[in-house]
């Protein structure tokens, strides 16, 4: 995939939004580790965080390769992501895992929408980006399942993140839009 043969607006938006999402996920896991890092679930969170670090590294590389600017909301993602991770971890392992399940489910759904969009445009032209998104989507779904295996359903909080934009909480809809 080269700069010359792609829909720049679509690729810019995908890379910018995914970079912001992976940055936010990294901050969530950082917050969870600050609270639960020395507990029995610490290694589980660390393993998921390590994968998120790889995702962020790849999107950093894609931003440079395709000359995409980051979202203006990076400082916001920094603070809010950490606060969300630490705040849910303060509710215990189950609260942190409930957050993980909700966030990873939402991200996987978002990646699925991007895959559909790129497949409709030209799957051969976007094969490199499609491979990255598919791989990361699959890893996000693994994190979702790990959260369920570690008692997310027993959490003291109930995260509902809708899959359809009209069902998605207004604040989250605005954040996805602003990240682009």
Place the predicted regions along the sequence by residue.
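Non-heme di-metal
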Residues: 1-180
């Amino acid at each position: 995939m080269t700069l010359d043969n792609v829909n720049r607006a679509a690729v810019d938006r995908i890379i910018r939004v995914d970079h912001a999402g992976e940055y936010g996920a990294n901050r969530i896991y950082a917050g969870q580790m600050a609270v639960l890092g020395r507990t029995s679930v610490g290694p589980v969170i660390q393993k998921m965080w390590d994968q998120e670090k790889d995702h962020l590294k790849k999107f950093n590389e894609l931003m440079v390769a395709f000359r995409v600017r980051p979202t203006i909301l990076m400082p916001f993602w920094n603070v809010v992501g950490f606060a969300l991770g630490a705040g849910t971890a303060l509710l215990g392992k189950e609260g942190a895992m409930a957050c993980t399940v909700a966030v990873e489910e939402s991200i996987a759904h978002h990646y699925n929408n991007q895959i559909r969009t790129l497949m409709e445009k030209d799957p051969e032209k976007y094969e490199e980006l499609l491979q990255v998104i598919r791989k990361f989507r699959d890893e996000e779904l693994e994190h979702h399942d790990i959260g369920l295996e570690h008692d997310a359903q027993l959490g003291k909080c109930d995260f509902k993140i809708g899959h359809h934009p009209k069902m998605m909480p207004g604040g989250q809809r605005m954040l996805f839009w602003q990240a682009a």
